């Protein structure tokens, strides 16, 4: 997953532009107060489609949601260890300041002349451009509870119910804050999260994290998961669809935000690899090579449910008829010590204006989805991702 540009010793893009003279252009704590997908022109990212333009941290909505997918994702879930609202507001202000610089490829802070002090920025991206870095933040219902803000919890912000067949592990379940860092370079994404966490070390600890990757090619093809099937074909792709499916239109502090359903899905690759092609395709209800639904020729042809096995993944998901925006990444963490097999799977991320959309889909999949023979849901969380930040403002200020 190493980007060729990472090893390029030539002058970086930002330095070239400078030399050429071109130049680059309360937390609701006050709370009262994919093929076509990769071509969508989200307002915060429409200049980033060539892979070389920065993605602004500021805007009506947070970047990293409808933003065209990047090649790498570093996701971390954090536990909060303060009940002081003022401390959390300051943390979110600091994160806003850091994030606005990180997405532009700048140091989080320039250091003084005292070499006996640790550098403020860890420095592993010096000389690199931002590689379309986006940073997305969300909070859980437990976050509100810890700060005595349960009365500010939106009605839609309900806990995810138990689902059939899941085997959730405590270490991958729950948490108070999520940070999703995506970029076209793995080290850039990690650097961003590392420095954000470093800034808040006296208030937060890491609960769990995963480094993900996506085979997005030139962004014109839907990425494939580790089972070799295209993942995200049915995604919504237009601004009109985003308003209908992704962005909340509530009158509370979540207006303009989105709910992230997060699932850590372990994929049993060795079992899958021993399964014949016909059975694999029956599991999905799509042809493996083309991604077309059964009975059709093209990936994006309309699905005819009558042509799909009754327990196929696509049929069960389509029966609910509630679109969501999938933004998932594959992961591989070496070897599972218990089994000696690959510890690999999917960081399933779905955004929607109402979490009930995801709940209804997953409930329909839970008991009879043939996919359950090859996967196990081991982690879960639901996070409210704020609306975007205007310049001069800070995360969660609505």
Give the residues covered by each predicted segment.
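Long, histidine/aromatic-enriched segments associated with O2/redox biology
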Residues: 18-34, 45-398
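N-terminal secretory signal peptides
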Residues: 1-15
């Amino acid at each position: 997953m190493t980007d060729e540009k990472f090893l390029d010793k030539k002058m970086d893009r930002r330095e070239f532009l400078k030399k050429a003279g071109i130049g680059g252009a309360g937390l609701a704590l006050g709370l009262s107060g994919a093929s076509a997908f990769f071509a969508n022109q989200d307002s915060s990212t429409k200049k980033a489609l060539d892979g070389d333009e920065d993605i602004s941290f500021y805007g009506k909505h947070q970047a990293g949601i409808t933003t065209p997918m990047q090649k790498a994702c570093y996701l971390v879930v954090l536990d909060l260890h303060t009940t002081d609202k003022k401390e959390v507001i300051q943390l979110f202000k600091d994160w806003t300041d850091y994030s606005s610089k990180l997405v532009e490829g700048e140091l989080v802070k320039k250091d003084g002349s005292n070499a006996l002090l640790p550098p403020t920025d860890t420095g592993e991206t010096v000389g690199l451009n931002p590689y379309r870095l986006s940073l997305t933040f969300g909070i859980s219902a437990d976050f509100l509870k810890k700060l005595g803000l349960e009365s500010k919890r939106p009605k839609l912000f309900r806990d995810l119910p138990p689902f059939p067949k899941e085997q959730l592990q405590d270490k991958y379940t729950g948490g108070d804050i999520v940070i999703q860092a995506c970029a076209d370079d793995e080290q850039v994404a990690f650097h961003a999260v590392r420095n954000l966490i470093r800034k808040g070390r006296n208030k937060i600890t890491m609960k769990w994290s995963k480094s993900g990757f996506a085979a997005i090619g030139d962004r014109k093809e839907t990425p494939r998961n580790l089972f070799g099937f295209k993942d995200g074909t049915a995604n919504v792709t237009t601004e009109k669809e985003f308003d209908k499916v992704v962005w909340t239109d509530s009158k509370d502090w979540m207006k303009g935000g989105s709910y992230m359903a997060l699932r850590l899905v372990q994929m049993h690759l060795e079992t899958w690899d021993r399964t014949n092609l016909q059975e694999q395709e029956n599991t999905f209800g799509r042809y493996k090579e083309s991604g077309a639904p059964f009975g059709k020729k093209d990936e994006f042809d309309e699905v005819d449910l009558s042509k799909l096995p009754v327990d196929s993944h696509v049929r069960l998901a389509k029966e609910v008829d509630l679109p969501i925006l999938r933004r998932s990444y594959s992961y591989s963490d070496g070897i599972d010590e218990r089994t000696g097999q690959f510890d690999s799977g999917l960081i399933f991320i779905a955004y929607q204006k109402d979490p009930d959309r995801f709940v209804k889909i997953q409930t329909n999949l839970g008991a009879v989805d043939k996919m359950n023979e090859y996967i196990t849901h081991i982690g879960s969380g639901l996070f409210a991702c704020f609306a975007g930040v205007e310049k001069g403002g800070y995360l969660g200020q609505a």
